[in-house]
Design a protein with these regions (language model features):
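N-terminal Rossmann NAD(P)H-binding glycine-rich loop of SDR-like oxidoreductase domains
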Residues: 4-24
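NAD(P)H-binding glycine-rich loop region in Rossmannoid oxidoreductase-like domains
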Residues: 40-93, 101
Length: 254
């Protein structure tokens, strides 16, 4: 049985990944903060390990030796500048700790949950060949996601097989804020307005499966980008998404 170590296991993407790993027969060790709500994660047959990615000692104590795959899902998506210091600590220093611990524990593969935000501000279609400008971005989230990728690339150069995944806007089960909140407002006809624009959306089930596929791809190192552009009237797009969001209507196909 393959073994997985998952950070961010109590979050939206982490819970879906844990569920998919178990469905595919993996043995899961789930890192969680001491203060985290374990109501959802506690339902799954996983090994719960308290710790924090910003605490290297707790990571070393939690991560199994020679684990088949480390899934670094934990991340700070804050867009409030007053919390930039914490975001930098968690996204950059936390990723550095995960990479260094994975190397020390001889992990066979690492998969990083990054974001298309790590490409910065771009025009046109994004591909894996697109050059990021996020390192100079005034948006701390963009910059720290790119810097987190840099930590993984350092790990690759040090001999750690790793893959970076760049999903767009993730929607699906276990989301209790973000897009889910927007969809509920639309479903209740309480959305006051919507600006024109587009969003690249991907279902969380596909994101979870992509992580596992990346971990099973042997020594392959690279970036997998998910982007599904939507266009047209923004309120219409939001209504379509709301009608198919789990908990509101028919679940989106995974």
């Amino acid at each position: 049985m393959k073994g997985a170590f998952v950070t961010g296991s109590t979050g939206f993407v982490g819970l879906n990944l844990v569920e998919e790993l178990l469905r595919q027969g993996w043995q899961v060790t789930a890192l969680h903060r001491v203060e985290s709500d374990l109501a959802e994660l506690g339902r799954f047959p996983v090994t719960l390990m308290p710790g924090d990615i910003t605490d290297a000692a707790s990571l070393r104590a939690a991560m199994p030796e020679d684990v088949d795959a480390v899934f670094h899902v934990a991340g700070n998506t804050n867009l409030w500048s007053r919390r930039n210091a914490r975001q930098t600590r968690e996204n950059v220093e936390g990723t550095r700790n995960v990479v260094e611990t994975a190397l020390a524990r001889a992990a066979r593969k690492l998969a990083l949950t990054s974001s298309i935000a790590a490409y910065g501000e771009q025009s046109g279609e994004l591909t894996e060949a697109t050059k990021s400008n996020a390192g100079k971005s005034w948006i701390n989230y963009q910059r720290t996601k790119w810097l987190a990728e840099e930590e993984v690339r350092k790990g690759i150069r040090a001999g750690l097989p790793a893959t970076i995944l760049n999903p767009g806007a993730i929607i699906g089960r276990y989301d209790t804020s973000g897009w889910a909140r927007l969809f509920h407002l639309v479903a209740q006809d309480r959305l006051p307005g919507a600006l024109p624009g587009e969003v690249s959306a991907v279902h969380v089930g596909e994101v979870a499966k992509a992580h596992i596929a990346a971990a099973e791809a042997g020594a392959l190192c690279g970036t997998a980008a998910h982007h599904r552009p939507r266009s047209g009237d923004p309120r219409g797009d939001h209504r379509q998404a709301a009608a198919t969001h789990p908990g509101i209507g028919r679940a989106l196909d995974a």
